[in-house]
């Protein structure tokens, strides 16, 4: 009888093409997502070598990082560097016969939102993209992670990837979440617990009753930020919630093929007694709405807390690092999180740009007005999310409240397009990174859930949404 295996073990074993004595493996790749930033050199490498894309039907190209989100983008991209990258992807996709969603396509959006929407992402698959937040797709019980540009070329040419297996880590979150506490709070709490290096060298499996109770969109939020916890990939075993989500997607199997797929997908779980090299446990009932205070995703506290004092940290290097973060953020120890005023709000990104995220934000914004002096923007994660939100009237709620309703794209998650912070501006953001300069030169980012961001836009400062009305 074979030894018990983890979910990661099973997917890995099913995709190993060859293994060397030192543990280096050649892994078959089921799906390859491509965007305009990390792909130009890869396609050029193919062109120079006279190679084709080995499996164009397993490759999907989407523009997201550089595209403007303003309504006038139909008139063209003004920024020359951005325009060149977008035009290059369009040409490369055409030259190599790869399906491509341009900024004029209703299916266009952030690549990690588009893949699941189209059923391109399915359980049990290996999925890669030249983007560290590819871990998002692990929510479906797939092994998904980011790769570098040279690896993008390798996958395009061979549909394989050279890898060494990571260790297994289990993050178990048990219990029931309190009202107002979301998947974003779970993932920020996990990173606060393990630190940004806690998952280094591991693939994380998220489990427990609190994870099981999440929708697919919530699970995607959790897996999305695995890389912020140091892990290249994070995954959740597929279940009935997963099957119900994927079955009506355009690229999902249908009829008898779907039944066969589901019978296989049901085997994708960690066996009883499977070995994990590291186990972390959290009590969902003890998680409150989370706000980041520093310049690392591990710098988090509950909204009811105060800005911590770095002098309480024993490690000298880390203590100095946290003081630098406070200086950059313009904060002082002991400040109540609810006293921190904001200038900007960004609701969107591959972490929180889905329809459920917009519904959460709209519930906070309904019948209210954005505070004077606050610039708040809503960026749907895809054209399909935007259409659904407008069909539900969410756009009207946001516009009447004073939010800016935008077109889909990565937007202010990163300062690679027109949406960015000015020096010194403080932003409540539903994105995944609060690094120095991430949202703009000297911009100050606080990571929060969509509901927390919307409430901050209305109040002009952070509030505990469990008590705020």
Curated annotation (Swiss-Prot):
Q: What is its EC number?
A: 4.2.1.33
Disulphide bridges = none
Pathway listed for it?
Amino-acid biosynthesis; L-leucine biosynthesis; L-leucine from 3-methyl-2-oxobutanoate: step 2/4
**Which keywords belong to this entry?**
4Fe-4S, Amino-acid biosynthesis, Branched-chain amino acid biosynthesis, Iron, Iron-sulfur, Leucine biosynthesis, Lyase, Metal-binding
Q: Which reaction does it catalyse?
A: (2R,3S)-3-isopropylmalate = (2S)-2-isopropylmalate
Please share the entry's free-text remark on the cofactor.
Binds 1 [4Fe-4S] cluster per subunit.
Q: Which cofactor does it need?
A: [4Fe-4S] cluster
Which BP terms from GO are recorded? L-leucine biosynthetic process
Out of the domains of life, which is the source?
A: Bacteria
Residues that bind [4Fe-4S] cluster: 350, 410, 413
- One Pfam match: Aconitase
The Gene Ontology terms for molecular function here are: 3-isopropylmalate dehydratase activity; 4 iron, 4 sulfur cluster binding; metal ion binding
Q: How does it assemble?
A: Heterodimer of LeuC and LeuD.
Role noted for this protein: Catalyzes the isomerization between 2-isopropylmalate and 3-isopropylmalate, via the formation of 2-isopropylmaleate.
NCBIfam families named in the record:
leuC (TIGR00170), PRK05478.1 (NF004016), PRK12466.1 (NF009116)
Write out the similarity annotation.
Belongs to the aconitase/IPM isomerase family. LeuC type 1 subfamily.
Q: HAMAP family recorded for this chain?
A: LeuC_type1
- Protein name listed in UniProt: 3-isopropylmalate dehydratase large subunit
The protein's gene is named leuC
